[in-house]
Amino acid sequence: ELVGLREEDVDTRQKQIRVFGKRAKERIVPIGEGLCELIEEYRKNKCKLLGEQVGIGTFLVRKKKNGEWQAMDAQTLYNIVRARMGEVSTLKKHSPHVLRHTFATAMLNNGADIRTIQSLLGHASLAATQVYTHATFEQMKEAYEAAHPRSRK
């Protein structure tokens, strides 16, 4: 999804990104002010670097060995994410997919509704979203104690 983003899909004024998922299914994902600022900084630097090639409509670009700029491919993005996660994460696996799992779990742990998470991830079925959300045992215990009538007996 990320490598397919085009410049017109990223709207920092509205604080949203238009994402095209599987089977070209479109969804709108909100983004925060901090990310908007980083995107605007990226765009300024991208314009300076691309120069005459500024017409490239792809949001993410990379420089080829011959000096030309082109759309970033999935493998390059994977390598970048893996390297950066290795620098800052204690997780064993480092990939964009792990970031999706982490995002979904963090949203759930901070009170987001599972249906909202489903929409943000672009899942057609709730079952697919549930695979991405990892509740801790403590959270399950708290929910059980709060909601089940016989939990305190």
What kind of feature is each model-predicted range?
Residues 41, 135-153:
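DNA/chromatin major-groove-contacting recognition/catalytic segments
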Residues 5, 106-107, 120, 143:
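Short alpha-helical segment immediately N-terminal to, or the first helix within
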Residues 29, 78-119:
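Short, basic (Lys/Arg/His-rich) helix/loop patches that form interaction surfaces
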